[in-house]
């Protein structure tokens, strides 16, 4: 069994902003145990039209393929010992529960370097799984380079099924999306405020 790590250049407005700010070629990292690359896990937005509200999610390939144009990716393969495989199966099985206490760390993604308990960005989650801290996607990319198995357009590996049933495609609209964003940041700030007193929500 192997762990597959995918760096992607997403065709979203937020993805473009991140790449311009960081100077990186890619702006997102996703993980999977599926050799067919049809479903991933990551920390990212819940729905397409609310970019700063998210958590620990499942990412069907359609999330990357639904927009027109190529989807540049780099994919890496890491062989896993049996005990690590079992641990990752259990960890990945927890993805997709929107009621979970695990949140997307929008504050760190935007401005801060603090680690807020129970919160991750896609990069910090990959760091957590790999057991090594990476400060940028470029640093992660360099570390994984010897394990690359593919570089190019994701469409050459995975076909868009046309399925749009994933919650990602259920738009919230401006008013509800704005309210979701206010609530999300309020929770993050509250956690940050009591960070030294609260119990960490462990991922492992």
Residue ranges and their predicted role:
Residues 1-204:
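Cysteine-nucleophile amide-bond enzymes
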């Amino acid at each position: 069994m192997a762990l597959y790590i995918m760096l992607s250049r997403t065709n979203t407005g937020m993805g473009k902003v991140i790449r311009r700010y960081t100077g990186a070629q890619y702006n997102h990292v996703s993980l999977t145990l599926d050799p067919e690359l049809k479903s991933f896990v990551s920390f990212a937005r819940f729905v397409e039209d609310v970019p700063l509200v998210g958590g620990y999610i499942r990412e069907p390939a359609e999330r990357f393929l639904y927009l027109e144009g190529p989807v540049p990716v780099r994919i890496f393969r890491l062989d896993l010992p049996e005990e690590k495989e079992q641990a990752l199966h259990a960890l990945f099985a927890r993805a997709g529960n929107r009621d979970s206490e695990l949140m997307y760390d929008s504050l760190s993604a935007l401005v801060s370097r603090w680690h807020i308990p129970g919160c991750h960005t896609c990069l910090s989650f990959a760091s957590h799984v790999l057991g090594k801290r990476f400060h940028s996607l470029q640093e992660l990319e360099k570390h994984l380079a010897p394990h690359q198995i593919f570089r190019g357009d994701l469409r050459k590996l995975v076909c868009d099924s046309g399925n749009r049933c994933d919650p990602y495609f259920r738009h919230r609209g401006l008013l509800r999306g704005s309210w979701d964003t206010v609530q999300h940041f309020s929770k993050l700030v509250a956690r940050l405020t009591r960070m030294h007193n609260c119990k960490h929500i462990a991922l492992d």
